[in-house]
């Protein structure tokens, strides 16, 4: 099970939201690059970054910040948030992003996904489905799509998509456990590779999530639980007297 730390960027800062609510925002670091380096030093094998400003506006507001992160680290970076055109995808992939996540556009402009699959392999293009009670939400979770989550997944599957990033909005940022039943139901019906997201709070959640591997759930994105140090092993990664060093510590993880 690949564990992927999340970095959400809003107004140039590293933040976390509760259930996607922009009014419930907590700033963790002013510089998202520092956060990315911390996660890499803690041996992350991949990062999931969301441009929250872009999710709302469709403009690549934090492009330069993301470019700095991609240039600095030696691991794949997955990008989501407001990616709604071939040009945006090309700019990210040309920058060196490992793969892009298409969210709202999969609902509002499904033909775009078909075009993307003609230009790039499925390993580069994934679709993000953020669902509440089984219904995908779009445009920064502010609008309903009017279809079932698995229906959208099957449409994307027909276009050549092989992986879905699935978020149970009701669990995201709540620190109350992930949506086991909703994720299992979705994975069973979709028949695709699934990266679970939203609500994983502790090691027990990870163990439960691992039981869904037979249904295609092979990875998980973790946000707030990491930021709140909910995993005991994180205490070993921090130097509480001096603070974590971004340039060198006992980790063998490398920066470029």
Curated annotation (Swiss-Prot):
CDD domains the record matches: HisA (cd04732)
Pathway: Amino-acid biosynthesis; L-histidine biosynthesis; L-histidine from 5-phospho-alpha-D-ribose 1-diphosphate: step 4/9
Domain of life the protein comes from: Bacteria
Residues forming the catalytic site: 8 (proton acceptor), 130 (proton donor)
Record field: catalytic activity: 1-(5-phospho-beta-D-ribosyl)-5-[(5-phospho-beta-D-ribosylamino)methylideneamino]imidazole-4-carboxamide = 5-[(5-phospho-1-deoxy-D-ribulos-1-ylimino)methylamino]-1-(5-phospho-beta-D-ribosyl)imidazole-4-carboxamide
Assigned GO CC terms: cytoplasm
GO biological process terms on file: L-histidine biosynthetic process; L-tryptophan biosynthetic process
Location in or out of the cell: Cytoplasm
Protein family: Belongs to the HisA/HisF family.
The protein, known as: 1-(5-phosphoribosyl)-5-[(5-phosphoribosylamino)methylideneamino] imidazole-4-carboxamide isomerase
Species in which this protein is naturally found: Chlorobium phaeovibrioides (strain DSM 265 / 1930) (Prosthecochloris vibrioformis (strain DSM 265))
Highest classification ranks of the organism: Bacteria, Pseudomonadati, Chlorobiota, Chlorobiia, Chlorobiales
Designated gene of the protein: hisA
């Amino acid at each position: 099970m690949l564990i992927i730390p999340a970095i959400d960027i809003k107004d140039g800062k590293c933040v976390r939201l509760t259930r996607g609510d922009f009014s419930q925002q907590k700033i963790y670091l002013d510089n998202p690059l520092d956060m990315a380096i911390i996660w890499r030093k803690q041996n992350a094998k991949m990062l999931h970054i969301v441009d929250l400003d872009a999710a709302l506006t469709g403009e690549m507001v934090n492009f330069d910040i993301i470019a700095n992160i991609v240039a600095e680290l030696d691991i794949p970076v997955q990008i989501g948030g407001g990616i709604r055109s071939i040009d945006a995808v090309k700019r990210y992939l040309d920058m060196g992003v490992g793969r892009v996540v298409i969210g709202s556009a999969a609902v509002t402009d499904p033909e775009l996904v078909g075009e993307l699959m003609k230009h790039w392999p499925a390993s580069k293009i994934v679709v993000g489905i953020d669902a509440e009670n089984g219904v995908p939400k779009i445009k920064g979770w502010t609008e309903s799509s009017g279809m079932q989550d698995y229906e959208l997944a099957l449409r994307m599957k027909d276009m050549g998509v092989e992986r879905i990033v699935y978020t149970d909005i009701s669990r995201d940022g709540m620190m109350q456990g992930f949506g086991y039943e909703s994720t299992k139901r979705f994975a069973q019906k979709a028949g695709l590779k699934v990266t679970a997201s939203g609500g994983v709070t502790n090691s027990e959640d990870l163990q439960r999530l691992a039981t869904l591997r037979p249904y295609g759930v092979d990875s998980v994105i973790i946000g707030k639980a990491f930021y709140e140090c909910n995993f005991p092993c994180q205490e070993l990664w921090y130097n509480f007297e001096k603070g974590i060093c971004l340039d060198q510590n006992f980790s063998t993880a490398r920066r470029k």
